[in-house]
From Swiss-Prot:
UniProt organism field: Yersinia pseudotuberculosis serotype O:3 (strain YPIII)
Source lineage: Bacteria, Pseudomonadati, Pseudomonadota, Gammaproteobacteria, Enterobacterales
Protein name: tRNA U34 carboxymethyltransferase
Superkingdom as given in the UniProt entry: Bacteria
GO biological process, one term: tRNA wobble uridine modification
Residues that, per the record, bind carboxy-S-adenosyl-L-methionine: 91, 105, 110, 130, 181-182, 196, 200, 315
Keywords: Transferase, tRNA processing
Record note on quaternary structure: Homotetramer.
PANTHER family, per database record: METHYLTRANSFERASE (PTHR43464), TRNA U34 CARBOXYMETHYLTRANSFERASE (PTHR43464:SF95)
Similarity comment: family membership: Belongs to the class I-like SAM-binding methyltransferase superfamily. CmoB family.
Record's function text: Catalyzes carboxymethyl transfer from carboxy-S-adenosyl-L-methionine (Cx-SAM) to 5-hydroxyuridine (ho5U) to form 5-carboxymethoxyuridine (cmo5U) at position 34 in tRNAs.
Length: 323
């Protein structure tokens, strides 16, 4: 099973040390009581991957690992078979020793939209809420972060992260924990907190904003990326049964409304940094994610609308500070 001892040792002497009052018992209970029916199959694939240490590692312009001399075709095929056992791959892409994992999302494009607007990450302790496979954690490390911690209750994503970590030489600067933010104590210990692609899945979005705030140090920075609609500060879409075929979408505010929500929750220096329509080039079906994707979620005759008739996905990045 997954061993979290390295993470416990890492945080024992820093501002995250109070987390050790609750975290080990939480994760022990998770391993005993909450494992997904396929978890052993997924983790078996991770265990059968080779432990590789790249001679060239680029986390600044992507997540790329190479080795000189290169691994053999047979090794690459074995590695690919194990990684394919962890499909679907949604967040990436990853370039590993000549193998290209072409994920559903071009998460590197989102990173390019976010990065110019945020405070430098060098030396920072970071929390990424809803981190998925951990792609952005590695990009944060590429920007010089001291420690990047991701939380996501989806257990396949944890196994994907551990697979990538193993192929990057067992790097201990990034960690993923199988938790939701509601399971975290109020740590007030992270310099930057990211919540990207999460808010619209929350039944109580203001509670989510308070939960994010409670993880930040004083003067810490929130990076919030989420679906929005066009409109003024009073505009909020509450979809019916589904939005873009997703059942669990509750509130999609306009960017000005979201700014007002953040200010209502006590954040300051709130700014709308970026807005971008999601395209079928950024989110699409691939060889590593073979089920339906954005093209099937949009009106086939009018890509400005979802199949349900709502405005097509528009995403905003907002930056805010905890005073």
């Amino acid at each position: 099973m997954i061993e979290f001892g390295d993470f416990y040792r890492l945080i024992a002497k820093g501002p995250l040390s109070p987390w050790l009052d609750t975290l080990p018992a939480q994760l022990s209970a998770w391993q005993r009581e909450s494992l997904h029916g396929k978890f052993k199959t997924w983790f078996n694939a991770v265990e059968h991957l080779p432990q590789l240490t790249p001679t060239t590692l680029d986390l600044h312009s992507g997540v790329r690992a190479e080795m000189s001399p290169p691994i053999s075709a047979g090794q690459r095929e074995g590695m690919e078979n194990m990684l394919r056992a962890l499909m679907p791959w949604r967040k990436g892409p990853f370039s590993l020793y000549g193998l290209e994992i072409d994920t559903e999302w071009r998460s590197d494009w989102k990173w390019q939209r976010v990065l110019p607007h945020i405070s430098p990450l060098a030396g920072r302790t970071i929390l990424d809420v809803g981190c998925g496979s951990g792609y952005h954690l590695w990009r944060m490390i590429g920007e010089g972060a001291h420690l990047a911690v991701g939380i996501d209750p989806m257990q396949l994503f944890l196994c994907q992260f551990e697979a990538i970590r193993k192929l990057l030489g067992g790097d201990q600067r990034a960690h993923v924990l199988p938790l939701g933010i509601e399971q975290l104590p109020e740590l007030a210990a992270f310099d930057t907190v990211f919540s990207m692609g999460v808010l619209y899945h929350r039944r109580s979005p203001l509670d989510h904003l308070y939960q994010l705030k409670n993880q930040l140090v004083t003067d810490g920075e929130l990076v919030l990326e989420t679906l929005v609609v066009e409109g003024d500060s009073q505009q909020v879409l509450v979809p019916g049964d589904r939005y873009a075929q997703m059942r669990n979408v509750y509130f999609i505010p306009s960017a000005p409304a979201l700014k007002a929500w953040l200010e209502k929750c006590g954040f300051v220096d709130v700014r709308i940094a970026d807005m971008a329509v999601t395209t079928t080039e950024e989110q699409r079906r691939t060889d590593w994610m073979t089920s339906e994707s954005l093209a099937e979620f949009l009106d086939p005759h009018d890509h400005s609308k979802t199949v349900e008739g709502y405005p097509a996905p528009l995403r905003a990045v907002l930056i805010a500070r905890k005073p």
